[in-house]
A protein has these predicted regions:
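A short helix-loop
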Residues: 40-147, 192-195, 218-243
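Short coil/turn connectors at secondary-structure junctions
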Residues: 13-16, 38-43, 53-56, 174-175, ...
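Adenine-nucleotide phosphate-binding core of ATP-dependent small-molecule kinases
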Residues: 137-164
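A short glycine/serine-rich beta->alpha loop
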Residues: 15-18, 68-73, 89, 148-152, ...
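Active-site neighborhood for divalent-cation/phosphate handling
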Residues: 2-34, 54-56
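Short acidic loop-to-helix transition motifs that present clustered carboxylates
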Residues: 22-28, 52, 184-186, 209-211
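Conserved phosphate-binding catalytic cores of ATP/NTP-utilizing and phosphoryl-transfer enzymes
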Residues: 19-44, 195, 216-220
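Catalytic phosphate/nucleotide-handling subdomain of diverse soluble enzymes
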Residues: 159-240
Length: 243
């Protein structure tokens, strides 16, 4: 769709110039400028399936600016792997990922741990794969118990998030981290980082996936911090209607 024609349908008035922001930059900007960042240093970890070409980036946020310090591209995608495993478990990819963590509670992660480990080539911060996830994994371990496989997948994902976090803490000495992209919606993995107490602050904003990227695109250009206090952004009258 032509962007100018699309915007005209909303009667936004004359459009003199269009400015574009890269997908992962918009994620990172939303995370950084949507925090009470001030002059403190933040690590922003962006993980999704495919953000144009990038699938996993790490950004340094300091002094009102963000700078990419690590980038990994397709086909090495943690998010795409999790979606492929979602489909392998008989669920709908890009929709039912949250059910994997629920199934994992009923399973034994150790049963297929070795099989899952063999898919990966990890040397943090690099997390790469020995297979192309875009081809799917529908025929992988065809006789595996679904709950046990879900447990192994969720356990590996949590291990990766913790591994990235430890690298940020031990190598770069970050005290604050923000997780962005669809993978940031994996609550058990983020809770593990919070409960480890290795960081002073762990931040995941509302809508860390693609819905938040519209705001991130603006923040990437304006480089202005926005106060996302619930009192300001979610203030409602007693009848439930926003003011």
């Amino acid at each position: 769709t032509n962007v100018r024609e699309y915007l005209k349908s909303y009667d936004v008035g004359p459009i003199n110039k269009l400015s574009y922001t890269k997908h992962h930059e918009s994620h990172a900007a939303y995370g950084y400028y949507g925090t009470n960042s001030g002059n403190t240093r933040w690590a922003i970890v962006v993980l999704d399936s495919i953000g144009e070409f990038e699938t996993y980036t790490i950004w340094d946020g300091l002094g009102g600016r963000i700078k990419r310090i690590h980038s990994q591209g397709y086909p090495h995608s943690i998010g795409l792997w999790y979606s492929a495993m979602t489909q392998r478990l008989g669920l709908v990819a890009n929709k039912d990922e949250y059910l994997v963590a629920q199934m994992a509670k009923q399973g034994n992660a150790e049963r297929y741990k070795k099989d899952v480990d063999e898919l990966f080539d990890i040397n943090y911060p690099s997390v790469k794969f020995n297979v192309n996830m875009h081809r799917g994994l529908d025929a992988w371990l065809p006789d595996a118990d679904a709950n046990d496989l879900a447990a192994a997948v969720q356990s590996k994902f949590e291990e990766i998030i913790m591994g990235i976090s430890l690298w940020l803490k031990n190598v770069h000495h970050y005290e604050q981290v923000c997780f962005m992209g669809g993978c940031a919606l994996n609550k058990p993995a983020i809770d593990n980082v919070i409960n480890s107490r290795m960081f002073q602050h762990v931040h995941v904003p509302k809508h860390p996936g693609d819905p938040g990227s519209c705001l991130g695109s603006v923040f990437a250009k304006t480089k202005t911090r926005v106060d996302f206090s619930d009192k300001i952004w979610y203030n409602s009258t007693t009848d439930g209607k926003g003011k």
